[in-house]
């Protein structure tokens, strides 16, 4: 397996698909990396020579990927929580951040439903 940016990418797949196994590289970025490295998108990873592999590694090194990108995202969320913005408060409470309704759904963010005891009816 070829190792790029600390990730073992699959050798049987095309290079443009294999690069997407790296966190922070999607389809468009993978295409740009290959274009800048002068490597065809259709070639398989196992067919790459050392020069092509090092060119791809050089291009990927210019992009924020993997641990650095995860750390940056986490720090951005922490900053929002520290300054007390609306988005930060929603993150802190574990509720949807982007304005979705929470009356009926939002189970992914809120977790399992909590049992709520009903109000007792007064006897007649």
From Swiss-Prot:
Q: Specify one Pfam family.
A: Ribosomal_S13
tRNA processing in keyword set = no
Residues in coiled coil = none
Disordered: region residues: 91-124
Q: Which SUPFAM superfamilies match?
A: S13-like H2TH domain
Q: Which UniProt keywords are present, listed alphabetically?
A: Ribonucleoprotein, Ribosomal protein, RNA-binding, rRNA-binding, tRNA-binding
InterPro entries to which the protein is assigned, alphabetical: Rbsml_uS13_C, Ribosomal_uS13, Ribosomal_uS13-like_H2TH, Ribosomal_uS13_bac-type, Ribosomal_uS13_CS
**GO CC field:** cytosol; small ribosomal subunit
Here the disulfide bonds are none
Family matches, as Gene3D superfamilies? 1.10.8.50, 30s ribosomal protein s13, domain 2
Signal peptide extent: none
Q: Which GO terms describe its molecular function?
A: rRNA binding; structural constituent of ribosome; tRNA binding
Q: Name one GO biological process term.
A: translation
Q: Which domain of life is it from?
A: Bacteria
This chain's function reads: Located at the top of the head of the 30S subunit, it contacts several helices of the 16S rRNA. In the 70S ribosome it contacts the 23S rRNA (bridge B1a) and protein L5 of the 50S subunit (bridge B1b), connecting the 2 subunits; these bridges are implicated in subunit movement. Contacts the tRNAs in the A and P-sites.
Q: How does it assemble?
A: Part of the 30S ribosomal subunit. Forms a loose heterodimer with protein S19. Forms two bridges to the 50S subunit in the 70S ribosome.
For this chain, the family text in UniProt reads: Belongs to the universal ribosomal protein uS13 family.
What is the name attached to this protein's record? Small ribosomal subunit protein uS13
Q: Which gene encodes it?
A: rpsM
